[in-house]
Each structure stands twice: as structure tokens, then as C-alpha cells.
Amino acid sequence: MRYGEKEIKEFDVENMEIWPNDAKNDYIIKITLPEFMCCCPRSGYPDFATIYLEYMPDKFVVELKAIKLYINTFMYRNVSHEASINEIYNTLKDKLKPKWIKVVGDFNPRGNVHTVIECRSDMVVPK
């Protein structure tokens, strides 16, 4: 097993590295992860997406290698577009407890269908 595979397989989300946020100002962190992959729970075929993560930290920020490893743990999992983005959102919201957070998964088209999933802490339900 190569070292990258080992790091991904051994990654434990419970021990995701987070750092204290010592900044006194409010600011937004924007992270783009253009190589997201998970497997379709029905067919097992790979699904690819770009993940856009934005958040306004409160007391904590995520270490960038930790978010990369966490995102890469999805590559061998059979999980839907919706479930993967909701899981990423919930995990980061619970770990970081940010003032505001948004996670968007922009999935590559499959079978002429393009899907974008968005979770955000200020979601307003349309009437």
C-alpha cells in the first residue's frame, strides 16, 4: 500500500485536526476541492464533483491536509450525492462550530444529468 492510500484508509474523522482561530475579525474561508469522488450506491460507478466549502470560523479552523484526507475517504464509499454533501456539511458544522457554513457539491454530469447539492447554515426554505 502506498503512503497516500495508507493515510486515507487510516484517517479518523473523530481525530480531524482543527486549529484555534485567534483572529479577532470576522472573515470567510473558501476552500475548493476539485477532485472529490464517491461511488454510486446503485451501480458502483464513480461519481466526480468539485466541493466548494465556505465558512466563517468562530473558535476553530480546519487544517487543510485534514480536510483533504477527509474528502478523500469518500472515494471508495457507496454514497449518494445528497448523502455525501450532507455528511460533509454536518461533520464540519459539528467539528468547527462556525458562525456560518456552506458546502456545495457540483457533480459532473452522468447520463445527461447535472446535479448541484448545497447545504448552508442560513438556508431559507422557499415558499
UniProtKB/Swiss-Prot annotation:
The reaction(s) this protein catalyses: 7-aminomethyl-7-carbaguanine + 2 NADP(+) = 7-cyano-7-deazaguanine + 2 NADPH + 3 H(+)
Q: Which GO terms describe its biological process?
A: queuosine biosynthetic process; tRNA modification
Please name the pathway. tRNA modification; tRNA-queuosine biosynthesis
A GO term from the CC aspect:
cytoplasm
Query: What cystine pairs are annotated?
Result: none
Q: What is its EC number?
A: 1.7.1.13
Question: Which leading EC class covers this enzyme?
Answer: oxidoreductase
Q: Where is the active site?
A: C40 (thioimide intermediate), D47 (proton donor)
Any one Pfam family match given in the protein's UniProt record, by short name: QueF
Q: Where in the cell is it found?
A: Cytoplasm
- Return the HAMAP family for the record: QueF_type1 (MF_00818)
Query: What PANTHER family does the record tag this protein with?
Result: NADPH-DEPENDENT 7-CYANO-7-DEAZAGUANINE REDUCTASE
Q: What does this protein do?
A: Catalyzes the NADPH-dependent reduction of 7-cyano-7-deazaguanine (preQ0) to 7-aminomethyl-7-deazaguanine (preQ1).
- This protein is called NADPH-dependent 7-cyano-7-deazaguanine reductase
Origin organism is Campylobacter jejuni subsp. jejuni serotype O:2 (strain ATCC 700819 / NCTC 11168)
